[in-house]
């Protein structure tokens, strides 16, 4: 190749990239910083525009409210003036044509502001168009320049104009004019309707106000969360109330944590048994014929087991001033004339035995009590109306004052029972006691206690029970009708007089065969009493009874033995009637009358 020729490397053999010769790291950094600055300015401009827009809207809202208030006041004043003018014109009876003309004249005057507003809109629009044209021209000229500084000047120019007072004022005026145009049209229509009649204008004015439904909707829309909270609280209260009011009364929820003891006491239902027991305990006292204070009541009852009872209960059947009359068992009192009475809150006094009746096992004791004591007389019932299975309670002091006021429950197990009693403890029965049977538990110390019905009335005096192996729940009480009658006699006379026929008798069933044959009794006669001796001038002799007579029937009742004979005779102690009897004399049956007086 010649030396004078230029050495040229073919383009296809040129291996390096051309831009590597023109790479300027400082320029690249400057470009990135300018881009970042433009982005920040754009974000700032957007944020400022948003704030200005919100500020403009707030100003518009305030302007609207103020203008609405002024317009409303002006409207009401105008309507009041119109009503006054219409009332004055109605005296001259103006025609409908004049009224219509009057309305038509007013309408152009009211429409004129709309035309002015339209003109302003045109001016604003033209100004806006000119401004937009100016912006477009600048944008075209700026787009033609590829330099970075030119684009930056374009953004700055746009921001300066957008946030200029002229542009902001133009936008405010545009919003206000749009709002005014709508209100002017609404006022024209409202005034046109109000010019027809006063009633229609009133209805239109009321229609502008929010209705009750709108208020309710607005309230729920604004306060729906509070409403839900209130409803939830009410529902919770209702549920808790239902839990307390539906407690199981069968005892299954006794330990429920939601049930307090106070509520349980308030909700407790008193049964007839509970009422009777709480009333009767104030009429029950403890009777002891041992007035010493060396040992407890329980020890006395235990030590004297097998001996004459020294401790029992009593029922206050009468109260006169500070004195009380106590009905108890004769076997509790014994032969002593004084008894230790414990009543109320372990108060004691010494009572005097007014009288005892060993055949009926009834005794009466009188004593005085302290003032203010809660002891009261018990209500008397009627034992003749007892029904088998009737519920009863026994109130007494088993083992004395240590367990005073004890209550046991049961039913009437049997009526008209004849219970043999050994009075003198010689292992020979002396009398048949008329009693009713019950299954309520009766313990030592319950003797003389009260048997109470469901109404809290005294129907019997607990007297004895069958104490045998393999025998449970068989106790007996003296009917209150019999006990009260005996008590009144003891209170009045100190004793009870029984009729005495003056005859000595023995049981037919206890005779041997030879004696049975000597009396010439029929073989089928194996019950009754045979007369062994008749006292002179006795009721038996006056009645015509003789030795070896066999009495098999008395007062229409079969006579099984001497206990039954004595029971029938004693049952007529009050009336002393003459009783019909059937006897066998020399093997022949005869009827006879036995006198009791």
UniProtKB/Swiss-Prot annotation:
Composition-biased stretches (Basic and acidic residues): 1-13, 21-70, 195-208, 298-308
EC class name: hydrolase
Enzyme nomenclature, EC number: 3.4.21.-
SUPFAM superfamilies assigned: PDZ domain-like, Trypsin-like serine proteases
GO CC entries: plasma membrane
Polar residues composition-biased segments: 71-83, 125-143, 286-297
A GO BP annotation: proteolysis
Transmembrane domains' residue ranges: 224-244
Any one Gene Ontology molecular-function term assigned to this protein's record: serine-type endopeptidase activity
Domain annotation PDZ: ranges: 485-561
Cell compartment(s), UniProt: Cell membrane
Domain of life: Bacteria
Keyword terms of this UniProt record: Cell membrane, Hydrolase, Membrane, Protease, Serine protease, Transmembrane, Transmembrane helix
Keyword Cell membrane appears in the UniProt entry: yes
Keyword Protease: yes
InterPro entries documented for this protein: Chloro_Bact_Ser_Proteases, PDZ, PDZ_sf, Peptidase_S1_PA, Peptidase_S1_PA_chymotrypsin, Peptidase_S1C
SMART domains attached to this UniProt entry: PDZ (SM00228)
Pfam family for this entry, one: PDZ_2
Membrane topology per record: Single-pass membrane protein
Family: Belongs to the peptidase S1C family.
Listed name of the protein: Serine protease HtrA-like
Lineage: Bacteria, Bacillati, Bacillota, Bacilli, Bacillales
